[in-house]
Amino acid sequence: MDIPRSLRHPEILLVLLLSEITDICQAYCEADCKSYCCDGTPPYCCSYYAYIGNVLSGTAIAGIVFGIVFIMGVIAGIAICICMCMKSSRGTRVGVIRTTHINAISSYPAAPPPYSYEYEMDFPLDLPPPYTPTPPMSHYPSPPPYPGPSRK
């Protein structure tokens, strides 16, 4: 089977493709398309995205960053939910009082000892030292007059 002549020389195919694309991209700068026309000979129409340039790229970057942060938050929320569900399915944590312990305490035969609040009211006196008036300040002489012309 013979290879077609155009595929034997791929550079010819590339040149033909580029010439077709450039013919399509020639600008027809009418009144409604004027803002998207780029300078050149012949003038070519820029795409809307090239026209708005930096605004699009900044917005795109902000959107990508926001999307990544949002997805990370969703993943963290799902992970927390999974961990909480797995934790609640296990037994109680170490150190939590079980019902057998509560029953042992409540079934104690003797009454608890009397409780008094008085020891809480007796606190050591930790007061500041007594008030001592500040010594009178010595009077400083008034400052010298301003060296400029008087205001009179």
From Swiss-Prot:
InterPro entries: CYYR1 (IPR022640)
Native source species: Xenopus laevis
Residues in the signal sequence: 1-27
Stated name of the protein: Cysteine and tyrosine-rich protein 1
GO cellular component, one term: membrane
Segments on the Cytoplasmic side according to the record's topology features: 81-152
Membrane-spanning ranges: 60-80
Keywords tagged on the record: Membrane, Signal, Transmembrane, Transmembrane helix
Keyword Transmembrane tagged: yes
Membrane topology: Single-pass type I membrane protein
Region (Disordered): 130-152
Membrane topology, Extracellular segments: 28-59
Compartments, as annotated in UniProt: Membrane
Stored Pfam families: CYYR1 (PF10873)
UniProt similarity note: Belongs to the CYYR1 family.
UniProt keyword Endoplasmic reticulum, yes or no: no
